[in-house]
Amino acid sequence: MPNQHTLLSSNLLPVGSNISTWWNFGSMLLTCLALQTSTGFFLAIHYTANINLAFSSVIHILRDVPNGWIIQNLHAIGASMFFICIYTHIARGLYYGSYLNKEVWLSGTMLLIMLMATSFFGYVLPWGQMSFWAATVITNLLTAIPYLGTILTTWLWGGFSIDNPTLTRFFALHFILPFMIISLSSIHIILLHSEGSNNPLGTNPDTDKIPFHPYHSYKDTLMITAMITSMLIIMSFMPNLFNDPENFSKANPLVTPQHIKPEWYFLFAYGILRSIPNKLGGTLALLMSILILTTAPFTHTSYTRSMTFRPLTQIMFWTLIVTFITITWSATKPVEPPFIFISQTASIIYFSFFIINPLLGWVENKIMMTNN
């Protein structure tokens, strides 16, 4: 391996030769983060964090600021693309057993939580009708905390209802959290490269490594180009594809939308929340829908790291993916039969994956031992 220069040697970082396209989503997420930070900065220049002016300032960006419509739409579509990439990234980690690198997996779970918080605060900023009511519903969940709930909610709101102080602090949080995400992403990448990437076979790649550049860097470039191209196509022809029609109306505390729902990327967690008729139980289920990912490294029982050669576990994995989509779909529907039953059933299946998976690992171990 040539070692003429530090920069050259970092480009020639040895990487397993068989990592597939599913490993490109990390670099795509970094691209999304850079895009969101840059477009967000230019939006913050023109945005006004005031309940009387916020909605008008967004319209001003779209209509009056040169290329403002490009910046605003890229930021909105970029958020959806960010979540598409991160959910695919997590699914790949679950499928190929990447979670066994505990530090990387746990730092990644923290990144997901911070990203969800950041995007929630950002969704409130335009001060549209759905922004206001989604903020009201989600922040109200804090009141489910025994003893401290009401105090925490009042502190977060900056008063006894969602008002100007709430919008101001949400803007401040939405501005500062991306820098924390950048810091944690750096830690995530450093931790990853201290041990090295996993691969589709889940084997030790030390026996067969190739330089990162040009082999994998070109693969990354291709996927990043495809992602940016798809974003530009959506921005040009379907800019409101991921937007809620209710959010084109200014926030009105006196008129409740017929169906309050967050952005699509929160719908799976929101669907789990709605499926439990108890406020505290629903809030705990909402938190557990994310935090249960942290259990994966500690409940792995199979002798094989990846699911590539584990057909029973593959069935469970694809059941999880279908369940995720089902919960997302059912959360867009009203809280009435049969959607309540569908959400509840799908939620049980979602959590059961993390219980059945270790049991299947034991079963597969027994089968392998018997065959040997």
From Swiss-Prot:
Broad class of the protein's primary localization: mitochondrion
Recorded GO CC terms: mitochondrial inner membrane; respiratory chain complex III
GO terms of biological process kind: mitochondrial electron transport, ubiquinol to cytochrome c
Protein location: Mitochondrion inner membrane
A Pfam family annotated for this UniProt entry: Cytochrome_B
Coiled coil start-end: none
Binding residues annotated for heme b b562, in chain numbering: 75, 174
Transmembrane segments: 25-45, 69-90, 105-125, 170-190, 218-238, 280-300, 312-332, 339-358
Bilayer topology annotation: Multi-pass membrane protein
Residues at which a ubiquinone binds: 193
Statement: the UniProt record of this protein carries the keyword Membrane: yes
Keyword Membrane: yes
Binding-site list for heme b b566: 89, 188
GO MF, one annotated term: ubiquinol-cytochrome-c reductase activity
Co-factor: note: Binds 2 heme b groups non-covalently.
Cofactor(s) needed: heme b
Keywords noted in UniProt: Electron transport, Heme, Iron, Membrane, Metal-binding, Mitochondrion, Mitochondrion inner membrane, Respiratory chain, Transmembrane, Transmembrane helix, Transport, Ubiquinone
Function comment: Component of the ubiquinol-cytochrome c reductase complex (complex III or cytochrome b-c1 complex) that is part of the mitochondrial respiratory chain. The b-c1 complex mediates electron transfer from ubiquinol to cytochrome c. Contributes to the generation of a proton gradient across the mitochondrial membrane that is then used for ATP synthesis.
Alphabetized PANTHER family for the sequence: CYTOCHROME B (PTHR19271:SF16)
Family note: Belongs to the cytochrome b family.
Complexes and interactors: The cytochrome bc1 complex contains 3 respiratory subunits (MT-CYB, CYC1 and UQCRFS1), 2 core proteins (UQCRC1 and UQCRC2) and probably 6 low-molecular weight proteins.
Further comment found in the protein's record: Heme 1 (or BL or b562) is low-potential and absorbs at about 562 nm, and heme 2 (or BH or b566) is high-potential and absorbs at about 566 nm.
Protein name: Cytochrome b
Species per Swiss-Prot/TrEMBL record: Hydrophis semperi (Lake Taal snake)
